[in-house]
Amino acid sequence: VRSASAMALARKAAASSMVLLKNANALLPLSKQTKRIALVGPLANNRAEVMGSWKARGEDKDVVTVLEGIKNKLGSGTEVNYVQGCDFLDPSTSEFSAALEAAKQSDVVIAVVGEKALMSGESRSRAVLRLPGKQEALLDTLRKAGKPLVVVLMNGRPLCLESVDKQADAMLEAWFPGTQCGNAVADVLFGDIVPAAKLTASFPLTEGQIPNNYNYKRSGRPGDMPYSSTVRHIDVPNRNLYPFGYGLSYTTFSYGEMQCPTAFDDKGFLPVSVDVTNTGNYDGEEIVQLYVADKVASMVRPVKELKGFQKVFIPKGQTKRVEFKLNVKDLGFWNNLMQYVVEP
C-alpha cells in the first residue's frame, strides 16, 4: 500500500484537489529562496486531523505534516519558525504573543487553520460555519505583524470565511489532504504544482444564505436590486463569497468567442467549442466549464446548469480548442406531469 508509486499518487491527488481562493498581488507561489517563514496554526504540525473523517483507517506515523513538507521542500536554507498559536476549541490565547513575535521576525506568515477531522462527515452538522475556537482571532493577531499572510484551510465542508478573506493576502483551500498533506501543500505553495481545481460547492458569506445552490430557480432568489428589501437579504448581498465552479491559478487564461451552431445534427448532438489561451507566465491546467440557461420555458428554470467540463493543460503562450458535445436531452427537464421534455 505504501509503495513509492502509491505515495506519489496520494501526493499528486491531494495537490490537484486544492483550490486557490485568493492571491492578492500574486503573492503565491512563494519563492524557494525565502529566508524566514512563520508557520502557525493548529493544523500546521498535526498528523491525525489532516486525514479527515476517515482518519481511523490511517496511521498517524504515515502522515507528512505541513511543517515537515515545507522543510522537505526548502531544506536548511530557510528558517521555519513554528508556533501552534491556538487549539481548535480551547479558548486560551496564551500562545498569541509568541505567534505574533514569530510573524514579526519572518518574511512571510503561513497559517494552517480549519476543522478537526470529526467535525465533518456523517452526523457532524454545525450551526455556525466559521473557523472554530480562537482561530479567527489568531489570524487577526498575525495580521498585526504587517507581513504577507498566507492562509491554508483544511476542512470537510464549505465555511463562512468573509472575515478570514479580509485578513489573508492569499488563501488556499486544501480540504483534508491525507497522508501526503505536507508535501502536497508545499508543492502548491512553492509553485511546483500550479493550482487548477474549482469549488464543487459554494462558500456563503453567512449561514443565513443557505441553501445556496448555484443552479437556483430564477424566482427563488432574485438578483440584488437597490432600494428594495423584498428581493434580497436586508443585511448581506445575495451573492456567495466564493461560488460553485470558482478557483484561481498562478497563470491566467483568456477565452475566445464560443462557437455553437444553431441546430442539433442528425444524431441529436450540438458541438460547442471555445479557444482558450494561456496568457500568463506559467504552464497550467484550466477546467473549462459549460453551462446552459433556459430563458423561456413552460416552467421556471434554473439560472444556469453545468452540462460539461474538461481539464486541459495549456503551456504558457499557447492556445487550445476545447470541444463539447451537447446531447439534445441535456436541454430537457421534468415537467409538472413528471414527463421529461425538451422544449423548442
Residue ranges with predicted function:
Residues R2-S3, N81-P148, V152-K166:
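Hydrophobic helix-and-loop "lid/oligomerization" segment in the mid-to-C-terminal part
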